């Protein structure tokens, strides 16, 4: 429920705020809902981490917020969602009317998911299992938010915890999922999340294909097929996007690389091509919060990508107000980047 129904419901609320045709699809609802969940968790988690609240309090606060939003969405859209399920979610209709390349892409994507879930759980990538998985499990078991040394098991003071853990939240988001579901963090990270993340990553690529070929679904399906083929051969280095997708999608850097940045590319090119609405600005700011939850790298990469897209569209359309609006959308990343810089200066500058 927490990873299937809740993102769909929250994303439906987001789509109602935006009120644009491109966001009125269940796949978009799920993506925007999942990113909104990450954004809300980031907003709540970082202050509670710095104030050294217990993990149980974080779980309660976050769950209440998700419960309220889900209840509102159910109250407003339950009837419409049920009608959509009856009309569109019949297996015979889902796979009807697509090209051969679409079916082949589905086979390849399913094969990648099965390979990762069934044959990769025993693979420990360097020391990242000791940090991501162990820290998530320690947070869940000790009820202290990232205050346990993953190598020694000793309790740390908040000043001893690395900034990249204090200012991001995806590790403890895995701990939250483990607490809510009753599953071990290892199962969440290496069995549950890969299915969700790989599915979302390829759906975004399909949307980008539609963006590149707006008049031909056939070409967008070929694009999806080509991407699924290329990914089979691109995990040769831990610096490739495919490596994050195919080997360790449960890491924050993977969320940034295969979910947040491609989604930002798609939405940025959508919103800057037409009249920019307040709802779309909110969506972009939510995406920035989600980026901040994943990795400190995203505090620089995500704003640069958004501003580059805005700059190109501003030149093409001679509407330079786009740059100001894009800059406002980058404020969430600027907040956490400012916190990072101040912490560094305070630590090493003697302030």
Predicted regions and their residues:
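Membrane-embedded, hydrophobic transmembrane alpha-helices
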Residues: 1-95, 322, 334-350
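Membrane-interfacial loop-to-transmembrane alpha-helix junctions, especially the N-terminal start
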Residues: 20-37, 101-102, 218-224, 277-284, ...
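Active-site lumenal/periplasmic loops and adjacent helix-entry segments of GT-C-fold
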Residues: 111-231, 242-250, 259
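Perimembrane helix-loop-helix junctions
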Residues: 302-327
């Amino acid at each position: 429920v927490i990873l299937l129904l809740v993102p769909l419901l929250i994303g439906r609320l987001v789509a109602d705020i935006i009120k644009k045709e491109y966001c009125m699809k269940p796949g978009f609802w799920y993506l925007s809902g999942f990113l909104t969940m990450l954004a809300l968790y980031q907003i709540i988690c970082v202050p509670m981490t710095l104030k050294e609240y217990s993990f149980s309090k974080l779980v309660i606060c976050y769950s209440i917020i998700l419960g309220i939003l889900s209840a509102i969405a159910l109250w407003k859209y339950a009837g419409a969602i049920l009608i959509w399920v009856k009309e569109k979610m019949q297996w015979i209709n889902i796979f009807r009317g697509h090209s051969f390349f679409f079916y082949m892409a589905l086979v390849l994507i399913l094969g990648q998911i099965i390979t990762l879930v069934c044959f990769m759980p025993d693979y420990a990538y360097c020391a990242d299992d000791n940090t991501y998985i162990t820290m998530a499990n320690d947070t869940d078991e000790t009820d202290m938010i990232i205050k346990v040394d993953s190598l020694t098991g000793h309790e740390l003071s908040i000043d001893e915890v690395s900034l990249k853990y204090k200012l991001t939240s995806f590790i403890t988001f895995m701990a939250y999922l483990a607490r809510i579901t009753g599953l071990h963090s290892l199962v969440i990270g290496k069995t549950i999340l890969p299915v969700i993340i790989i599915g979302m990553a390829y759906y975004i690529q399909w949307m980008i294909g539609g963006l590149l070929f707006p008049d031909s679904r056939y070409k967008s399906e070929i694009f999806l097929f080509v991407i699924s083929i290329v990914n089979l051969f691109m995990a040769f280095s831990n610096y490739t996007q495919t490596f994050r997708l195919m080997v360790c999608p449960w890491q924050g850097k993977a969320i940034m690389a295969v979910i947040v940045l491609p989604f930002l590319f798609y939405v940025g090119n959508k919103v800057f091509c037409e009249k920019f609405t307040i709802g779309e600005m909110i969506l972009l700011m939510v995406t920035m919060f989600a980026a901040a939850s994943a990795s400190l790298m995203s505090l620089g990469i995500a704003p640069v990508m958004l501003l580059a897209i805005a700059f190109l569209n501003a030149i093409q359309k001679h509407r330079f107000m786009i740059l100001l609006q894009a800059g406002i959308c980058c404020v969430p990343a600027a907040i956490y980047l400012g916190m990072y810089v101040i912490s560094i200066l305070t630590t090493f500058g003697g302030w």
